[in-house]
Amino acid sequence: MTDNSHSDIMIETEGLSKYYGDFIAVEDLTFSIKRGEVVAFLGPNGAGKSTTMKMLTGYLAPSTGTAKICGLEVADNRDEVANRIGYLPENGPLYEEMTPISLLNFFADARSIEASQKASRIEKVIDQCALQTVLNKPIGKLSRGFRQRVGMANVLLHEPDVLIMDEPTAGLDPNQVLEVRKTIKGLGKTILLSTHILQEVPEVADRIILINHGRLI
């Protein structure tokens, strides 16, 4: 197993493809993302963005080609890759009856974060995602923007090297979009985020990867 966690390349694909019978979901994607880059994965709905992200995170096996996170082939190192990434799917599930603080405590335990680090990790993600004012409110009663930030805090708990976010501002009102963009820009992580909104790209990303009909443009 090769570990290039100290390399500049944090996300890498080569010839990555996914087929469903005769249907081409994603075909021959080759790209790389360097440490510290925030990259927008831009394309219309149905372009193949979510399929690609699921292959990068190990939730979906590619038909052909390879995906690497921190130098590790995803297909061969799913557990280790899961420790290196924070994955925020579009409309990711949250326990709406829980409060943000109870949810963060629950997932800190579920991820076996050491007791000596648990409080400081939770405090750090609360600060990163600006959740101080809603910690004890039921998640189901929070605005969509705050719920998205709770989701971000959750995937940051284990201090991943790479963040993969699928449409992180989808369905938010303009003020919520600004809040989530500010949070993303302040994280200082290697981030791949998908969007179908061109105007959003310069506000949050360093560069763009364009995809349409499952192929890079």
Feature map (PLM): residue ranges:
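ABC transporter nucleotide-binding domains
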Residues: D8-T13, K18-N212
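Conserved beta-strand-loop-alpha-helix hinge in the C-terminal portion
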Residues: R215-I217
